[in-house]
Amino acid sequence: MAEEKKETMEEPKIGVYVCHCGVNIGGVVDVEAVRDYAAKLPNVVIAKDYKYYCSDPGQLEIQKDIKELGINRVVVAACSPRLHEPTFRRCVEEAGLNQFLFEFANIREHDSWVHMDNPEGATEKAKDLVRMAVAKARLLEPLEASKVSVDDKALVIGGGVAGIQAALDLADMGFKTYMVEKRPSISGRMGQLDKTFPTLDCSMCILAPKMVDVGKHDNIELITYAEVKEVDGYIGNFKVKIEKKPRYIDEELCTGCGSCVEVCPIEMPNYFDEGIGMTKAVYIPFPQAVPLCATIDKDYCIECMLCDEVCERGAVKHDQEPEEIEIEVGTIIVATGYDAYDPTEKLEYGYGRHTNVITGLELERMINASGPTDGKVLKPSDGEKPKRVAFIHCVGSRDEQIGKPYCSRVCCMYIMKNAQLIKDKMPDTEVTLYYMDIRAFGKGFEEFYKRSQEKYGIKFIRGRPAEVIENPDLTLTVRSEDTLLGKVTEYDYDMVVLGVGLVPPEGAETLRQTIGLSKSADGFLMEAHPKLRPVDTLTDGVYLAGVAQGPKDIPDAVAQASGAAARAAIPMVKGEVEIEPIIAVTDSDVCGGCEVCIELCPFGAISIEEGHANVNVALCKGCGTCVAACPSGAMDQQHFKTEQIMAQIEAALNEPASK
């Protein structure tokens, strides 16, 4: 246990510790010269250097000086605070010093790494950075973290394979978990697939048992055909409003017998079959649906009441209204999945105009035995089997012209999978793949790629097709450059399949703004750190899973979902979280209540109470936007107070180590 905190209102006694970081700093900067310079600065009682201060011996040396020399401020000149600031905060706290009486001078990323060709200049800059850190350290104040309690319930948004895995993991840990899915049944995109690559396992055979587990789990409350409309609060204490759309069927009474579907006279496009098949105005999405309950689409229903007449349980409720549900949870996992890219804007490929041009997901539903063609691959134009099929890779991916420069990571593999399945069903069919590069990066992927060539005889042409032309007989001519042969080719096909990429789902932007999340350049939700916090977000208590965070295959989505569940469980297990005190504070005597800070705060952490700004300590991230914008100077930021920053600036400008 840390020793009793030392009194810090006395005269500052500063210790400066300059790290070599092996040769990262020591190979460029004259560390000994920086150490000697620091020793002469006001209030510095000890200055030392060491090869690695982040190591145990280095930290023990700092702790020894705190205890024996009475040091009450510590400055470490080393690497990025992003990496080791928590390390040194713990170090000084274990020695009895408040952790916020520590200051970091970054002389690696800000100095040695960017001035490797100028050691002398780098050394002088290091002196400047250390002097600035010492100037701020003199004015540091002890701060104490606050704690907030955490509700031990969780919310999972999205009912695809990632959301299912996350919900089951949390529920198995004993936490009450709400799952919200916008469609009538959980399953996500995985439920639409026939087989999964590279093992060609039955997709629904893998997924359906997990779906059933979700529906039956005592700790999971499943809310389908619903969307999150409002999220207020902060980690441990989120208040969520959910709008549940009317099914016009009572979920508690419906047994999924299908009698209503049989008698319904109205047909409509089946969303689950990507619109290439038909269903009824009252429908059950697919046989394994969870919950197994019918839904009436009022856009098509003519209210003939035949469904009501045949329902023995009286489950049909034509007067059902939308329902607003309010829940309180401690943590949230966003697993909203993806949509397939709509290739209509790729006019050169003729999707939506050329009858026999379809997407990869539409082909998935054709191949599926429970799909609209009972597993037969048929040309949309005449219902006959195609003798020549072409696949075009990277439609909606790796294409800067349409603002989609990223790789969708699954297209190469799902195209080869479907090509193999076509050959299995129709061995005499000629299959050709037009590709830019084959990205077979996962376990078993390269072998899968080779099998496509060697066992199935699938033809590969390297090049992005320029145009797909529809001929009078509805065959299709694909004009493309073959970059390996260095010539333009034109081949005729009966059907062309577009390997469409993955894009953020409809409604993702609204949900992002509702929760207050960031997004990456490609539109997917952004993690807090790509390597160190890959499932966290910048909003504490909110985590990401699956393709919501970026394109990935099923194993990666499941692994990330389990990781997100584990991260979400940590604060709920503890029962409370510590809130760092580096936040904005308001001088109520100066604040005029102009609300400029409220408009600019990216985290919604400020409100007006009793005529002046009030900062919610749990929501504030200490970004300083309000401090910079406040016209009256009423806002300040702990640990980065105006006087502390000004002291650094004055130290940099008034006493430069070199001119």
Swiss-Prot record:
Gene: hdrA
Binding positions for [4Fe-4S] cluster 1 per the UniProt entry: 254, 257, 260, 311
Protein known as: H(2):CoB-CoM heterodisulfide,ferredoxin reductase subunit A
GO molecular function: 4 iron, 4 sulfur cluster binding; CoB--CoM heterodisulfide reductase activity; metal ion binding
Provenance organism: Methanothermobacter marburgensis (strain ATCC BAA-927 / DSM 2133 / JCM 14651 / NBRC 100331 / OCM 82 / Marburg)
Signal peptide per UniProt: none
Binding site for [4Fe-4S] cluster 3: 591, 594, 597, 630
Family: Belongs to the HdrA family.
Residues reported to bind [4Fe-4S] cluster 2: 264, 301, 304, 307
